[in-house]
């Protein structure tokens, strides 16, 4: 065991020796330095050598208000002095109460109950467990299954991973929690039917959920988990009418609709909760990342009064909880973050500028490697292809060589931190801080243009 504090110049080596990085091919850094980020300011981050990068992913879809916000840091420090920790297990503390009330006010419909977690995966896990226990309490104990979409990512806990629609991510941990079933997603760029008619495609995609409910048996299905804009695979927005049809189906078969907004909530699409942007009211919302702009970890499941009702009767208890759920410091930062959103009009800023962001990214359509540009708000994916006419994607060797071997490193080297992702077809994912302006969009486009032009020569 090492007891010496690492010298700054040795941080990269020490990281390789001791820091097991998440979702990371560790062998990549055996003979290469680990990128080490030491500070952030506004829309940019800086490494340990002083080099500046545009944060094109808001950390990990998290840093909505930008880096270096003194008011958020001060909110954390003040709360840590006043009450650093107390659980919300049969007790309350002021910041958890206030944040829960603020979220309930922002949520649509009768979603007035807030169950805090420490992150998004825990929020998804909470929603599934709550759905199961709800149906047991209401006399329908056989309703335990869930339906989600192909290629969708919903988290890493055992239940959330079962809901996830990425077989390669799940394979090492099988067998997982049984009862999670998949339907097609809303990738209209590769639609098997109705690719030229978004409304018809949306109806078809929603109807696949009904078909799966009928196939499994409506008396066995508890919930449907959907992101407003699906992240994995490269930002699939919902076709017109999709969520309205899904809501009808869920109501018809007494199935709960869970809007997984871990990424999409808190301004990413220009509204506090993304379901509002697409005009549907779910039974539960899972959220996390942007709630504090990343200045302290927290997550939540926001729940309708109807679902909460049986748990508020007699000796019934939701048999679930987390030590750090609703942590006082995180809750205080969440409140300060919501105050900042209101003060600076961040949601409206996204709505006012999302068209400019899209238009700037769509300039890349003139590159032969760019097949599709899709997304919503400040949340976009750029799908890469070998042939624009046939939409031919990369093969496995090309993905390894071009996406991993070249693009991931070269984009960062050229000053853009974003994500080159192959969880579906190869895409570049972009989600800059919500304080971004045209200057930020132009910087992203210029770096992408130069790097993708070079990548094309390597196919």
Sequence positions of predicted segments:
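Conserved N-terminal phosphate-binding loop of PLP-dependent enzymes in the Aspartate aminotransferase
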Residues: 2-459
């Amino acid at each position: 065991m090492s007891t010496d504090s690492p010298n700054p110049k040795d941080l990269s080596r020490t990281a390789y020796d001791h820091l097991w990085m998440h979702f990371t091919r560790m062998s990549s850094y055996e003979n290469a330095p680990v990128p080490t980020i030491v500070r952030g300011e506004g829309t940019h981050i800086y490494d340990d050598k002083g080099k500046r990068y545009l944060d094109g992913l808001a950390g990990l879809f998290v840093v909505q208000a930008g880096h270096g916000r003194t008011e958020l840091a001060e909110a954390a420090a003040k709360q840590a002095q006043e009450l650093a920790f107390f659980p919300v297990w049969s007790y309350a503390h002021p910041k958890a109460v206030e944040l829960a009330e603020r979220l309930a006010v922002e949520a649509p419909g009768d979603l007035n109950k807030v169950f805090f977690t420490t992150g998004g995966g825990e929020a998804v896990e909470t929603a599934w467990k709550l759905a199961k226990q709800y149906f047991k309490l209401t006399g329908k104990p056989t309703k335990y299954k869930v339906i989600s979409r192909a290629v969708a990512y919903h988290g890493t806990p055992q239940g959330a991973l079962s809901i996830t629609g990425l077989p390669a991510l799940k394979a090492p941990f099988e067998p997982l929690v049984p009862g999670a079933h998949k339907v097609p997603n809303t990738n209209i760029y590769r639609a098997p039917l109705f690719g030229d008619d978004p409304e018809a495609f949306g109806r078809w995609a929603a109807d696949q959920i009904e078909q799966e409910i009928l196939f499994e048996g409506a008396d066995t299905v508890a919930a449907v988990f959907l992101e407003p804009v699906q992240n994995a695979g490269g930002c699939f927005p919902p076709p017109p009418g999709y969520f309205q049809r899904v809501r009808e189906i869920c109501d018809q078969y007494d199935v709960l609709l869970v809007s997984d907004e871990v990424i999409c909530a808190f301004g990413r699409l220009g509204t506090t909760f993304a379901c509002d942007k697409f005009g549907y009211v779910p039974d539960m919302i899972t959220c996390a990342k942007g709630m504090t702009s990343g200045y302290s970890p927290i997550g939540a499941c926001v729940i309708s009064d109807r679902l909460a009702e049986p748990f508020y009767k007699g000796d019934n208890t939701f048999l679930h909880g987390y030590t750090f759920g609703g942590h006082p410091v995180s809750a205080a930062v969440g409140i300060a973050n919501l105050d900042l959103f209101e003060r600076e009009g961040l949601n409206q800023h996204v709505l006012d500028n999302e068209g400019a962001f899209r238009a700037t990214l769509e300039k890349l359509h003139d590159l032969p490697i760019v097949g599709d540009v899709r997304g919503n708000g400040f949340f976009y994916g750029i799908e890469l292809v070998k042939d624009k006419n046939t939409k031919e994607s990369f093969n496995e060797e090309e993905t390894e060589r071009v996406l991993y071997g070249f693009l991931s490193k070269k984009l960062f080297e050229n000053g853009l931190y974003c994500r080159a992702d192959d969880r579906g077809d190869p895409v570049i994912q972009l989600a800059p801080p919500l304080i971004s302006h045209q200057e930020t969009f132009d910087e992203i486009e210029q770096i992408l243009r130069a790097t993708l032009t070079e990548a094309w020569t390597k196919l």
